[in-house]
């Protein structure tokens, strides 16, 4: 009888542990929730729609234009316009697939103030460190001025920009590194909140997830659109999954 009780207790413990892991994994909509009617990548509509389905965060990309303005866009060259060497006016004249104009960061944040989802701001890697420093300074200043510092997290592939966010953002602001070439120990030494690495990096180094947690950091994986990969990451206990399929991920988490 005792052995039977111990067996069932063990099963319940394992099940409860899996449930806790699932509850701890948060959904980040990659470039917003854009795979739905009336939306487009990095559009204001995508931000609103990510908020409407209660995503933890909505990820978006930022460039500094030739006239030192901040705009929201992923590609360095989009619809024939090169972001770094074009003016704000030239960039924002681009029409997105849902009919919106490409937004400025200020426009994007103005809408975000009306919402609850967290802002996962990626600064794109620019041609020079000087450009990145100017961009970081402007971003941090704008975020603070608009009262969004407590809801904003920063991510970047650039080592320089990463260190600048850590240096210039308010103490305790989460800053994650994207490239995938630094160990958990190195990220901790930098002062990062943790890695935001491609799924393939964690497949190669699954031990890094536990190492990060042991060091007090959090773990984000991108861009995860396959159900099996989502299941694996949830089982490994990652804190965040960035996806183009936020509804699918939410459904999987609900079943846990």
Locations of regions flagged by a protein language model:
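Phosphate-group recognition and catalysis centered on beta-loop-alpha active-site segments
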Residues: 8, 20-256
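N-terminal secretory signal peptides that target proteins for export/translocation
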Residues: 1-2
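Sec-dependent N-terminal signal peptides
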Residues: 5-16
């Amino acid at each position: 009888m005792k052995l039977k009780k111990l067996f069932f207790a063990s099963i319940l413990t394992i099940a409860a542990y899996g449930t806790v892991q699932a509850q701890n994994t948060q959904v980040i909509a990659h470039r917003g929730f854009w795979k739905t009617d009336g939306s487009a990548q990095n559009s204001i509509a995508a931000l609103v729609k990510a908020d409407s389905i209660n995503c933890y965060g909505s990820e978006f990309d930022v460039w500094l234009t030739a006239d030192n303005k901040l705009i929201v866009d992923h590609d360095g060259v989009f619809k024939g316009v090169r972001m770094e060497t074009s003016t704000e006016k030239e960039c924002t004249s681009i029409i997105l697939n849902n009919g919106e104009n490409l937004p400025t960061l200020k426009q994007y944040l103005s809408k975000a103030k009306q919402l609850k989802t967290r802002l996962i701001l990626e600064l794109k890697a620019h041609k020079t460190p000087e450009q990145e420093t100017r961009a970081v300074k402007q971003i941090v200043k704008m975020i603070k001025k608009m009262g969004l510092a407590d809801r904003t997290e920063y991510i970047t592939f650039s080592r320089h920009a990463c260190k600048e966010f850590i240096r210039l953002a308010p103490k305790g602001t989460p800053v994650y590194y994207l490239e995938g070439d630094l160990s958990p120990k190195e990220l901790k030494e930098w002062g990062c909140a943790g890695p935001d690495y491609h799924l393939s990096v964690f497949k190669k180094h699954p031990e890094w997830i536990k190492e990060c947690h042991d060091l007090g950091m959090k773990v984000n994986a991108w861009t995860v659109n396959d159900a099996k990969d989502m299941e694996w990451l949830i089982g490994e206990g990652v804190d965040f999954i960035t996806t183009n399929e936020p509804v699918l991920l939410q459904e999987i988490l609900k079943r846990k």
